[in-house]
Amino acid sequence: MFPKLSESFYLRENVQLISKELLGKVLVTYIDGKYTAGIITETEAYQAPEDKASHAFNNRRTTRTEVFYNKGGIGYVYLCYGIHHLFNVVTNNENIPHAILIRSVEPLEGVDIMMQRRNKKKLDKTLTAGPGALSQALGITRLHNKIPLSANTVWIEDRNIPVESIVSTTRVGIDYAQEYKDKPWRYYIAGNKWISRG
């Protein structure tokens, strides 16, 4: 067994640093008796209340965004375009709405299960490259919203996988975010093929 990331990992203030440090960590799910895992290869940081790209911009509080205001170390899953379940990690202390979108993972364990869930015949990067794809492959849905990452359903492990170089660039699909659309708060492992098109 590899250690899960501790609560203190998520409770730190610097969401950009945490986003970078999640690269190379392993996102694991045990759902419906099926175990899957993938190396996190791509993340995006969201730093509300000032971040105009965040669902919690300007301390917006709705039924959907309330999860942001919990203490870090839980999952935030929302539906995009009514189709894709997107998995985020809530960070920082209570009432500070920071979150990190997990955009891509490299399949590691339970690949056959991932391919079955994604209805794939051939293994290629479309299996888990992209936030909707990775959630489907790992079995993550809205049912896992607010799930504690200390539990045994969805969690993140440190397996001491080295990450030599990280690329920082702009986030995807946030043209509405004015000056925040140009923040280099998307991170990915340089040279890794399991990255979304972005």
Curated annotation (Swiss-Prot):
Protein's UniProt keywords contain DNA repair: yes
One Gene Ontology molecular-function label: alkylbase DNA N-glycosylase activity
EC assignment: 3.2.2.-
Annotated Pfam families: Pur_DNA_glyco
NCBIfam families in UniProt: 3mg
Record-linked PANTHER family: DNA-3-METHYLADENINE GLYCOSYLASE
Similarity section: Belongs to the DNA glycosylase MPG family.
UniProt name for this protein: Putative 3-methyladenine DNA glycosylase
